[in-house]
Amino acid sequence: MNRCPACGKTYGDEARFCTRDGSKLVVVADKGATRETVAGRAEPPSAVTHANLVGRVLDGRYRIERKVGEGGMSFVYLAKDIASDEQYAIKVLSAALSSDANAMARLRREASLGMRLAHPNVCHIIRLGETPDGLVYVVMPYVEGEVLSDRNNRLGTIPIADVVHYVRDIAAGLHVAHELKIVHRDLKPENVMICAGPSGTERAVVMDFGLAKERRADAELQKLTATGIILGTPEFMSPEQLRGRPLDPRTDVYSLALMTYEMLTGKLPFSGRTQQEMMIARLRSDPMPLRDAMPGLGLEAVERVLQKAMQRDPGDRYQTAPEFATALAAASKVDGEEKSRLGRFFAR
């Protein structure tokens, strides 16, 4: 039998993590149990392989329906609650990550906080569990919609009114996390879902708080991420992230500003032949002005807001995500009024 050292809840021998707070369970010896048998129960399986989980029931509750995505570090499945028929997303971590003690310690710590992220603009963690063959999984609400990166690729650029709306939603979700001392660290378009909101509106939902980060890295950068020097996605990382310095909410503000720039122009504000060159540019160069990336866009006030949000020194940026979102909305209104004024002038 295993027990949570934090809340005292007991579990069977196969469980490793508390479903309430994510704490690692400790083994409680049965009467007559030897030191060897108790120690043996605490050991993870010696050989863990990632088999197809479709059709299996996890935790006696979640039936795996189909695989909906995968990355180098995880597989994502659609699952249904066998009692309520409600849909969930289950992210199953790779065997290598599931057996990595440091990664699991970080995941347990952040999952315990992530379970408290109840907000319409956040896909929060419901529970942390483990399959009988030793694979760690995370249960989340199933959010149906279009990934922001797919939306941007499909449209090329996104209208400023929609961008302001998405940024406001993302900032609201980030702020709740930041109040709990959680920094996303890997905010990017692939981690935002655009789904149906109330009364026919759209809602942006931030995904993957506290989870293992997927990486889009070239060979040079993979050497750094493999050592744990860098945690995040290179294209959207802040300068302090690249330098390996302590992170705070202003890191997510920087990443959100890069996402905003890409939504408006279809481009990133720093260029380079490799991701490493792009990283160096972020440390040494100023971002490309919005007017150069998209001539004729006519968003001078928005450009000034983005320039501030993308400052290399965190102290020179907007200090919170809502502050950035509010400034962006106000700048968009100023630019809209200026366009209307010019339109009336040239119509004379």
Placement of each model-derived feature along the sequence:
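Activation segment signature within eukaryotic-like protein kinase domains
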Residues: 166-167
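AlphaC helix of the eukaryotic protein kinase fold
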Residues: 94-116
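Conserved short submotifs of the Hanks-type protein kinase catalytic core
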Residues: 133-147
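AlphaC helix of the protein kinase catalytic domain
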Residues: 147-158
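Activation segment of protein kinases
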Residues: 49, 98-101, 195-239, 243
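A short, aromatic-enriched beta-strand patch in the conserved N-lobe beta-sheet
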Residues: 127-129
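Protein kinase catalytic-loop region centered on the HRD/HxD motif
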Residues: 171-182
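C-terminal lobe helix-coil module of Hanks-type protein kinase domains
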Residues: 80, 174, 233-340
